[in-house]
Amino acid sequence: MKRIFSTDLPDKLPGRLVLFASSILAFLAGTTVYLLGRDWATTQFLSPVSAWQPELQVSFGFLGANLPSLCHAYTFTLLIILALWPARHARVTGAFSWLFVASALECLQAEAISDAVVIGTSWFVGSPFADGLLAYMTNGHFDVADLAATAVGVSGAFVATSILEEKT
């Protein structure tokens, strides 16, 4: 019977499952910090359900502001790398693609950039994509620490997959 996948798949499967599990744990940790440490009324996708926010609001300090960005970057970079894994340059492609996307979305929240995008997208006002993008830019705020957390999360996923590749 001819194999569809790479011949080394069964040997590397346990390590890939560990990486997948670590991405899920990181996602849950980031989501927990995000939900417990932020005001839902000021969060774009949570504002419709802000009345349901628990009264207990935990302060995570510096971690509360940037841990969700780090976990988000780690999780999505790792999932992209795992999805591309049989490809020769999966780690580099996955890491740089998510770093580009996350950094671009963060930079869109910078006032100078968002002002230019608002002017450029004025023709498309009323379309769901343009309205969503404009709401994201105006409700969010640019934070260099989020860019740094994204870089650390992407680097962590890159290193984790590098270690797996060396061990198997």
Name the predicted role of every residue range:
Residues M1-T168:
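Bulky hydrophobic segments
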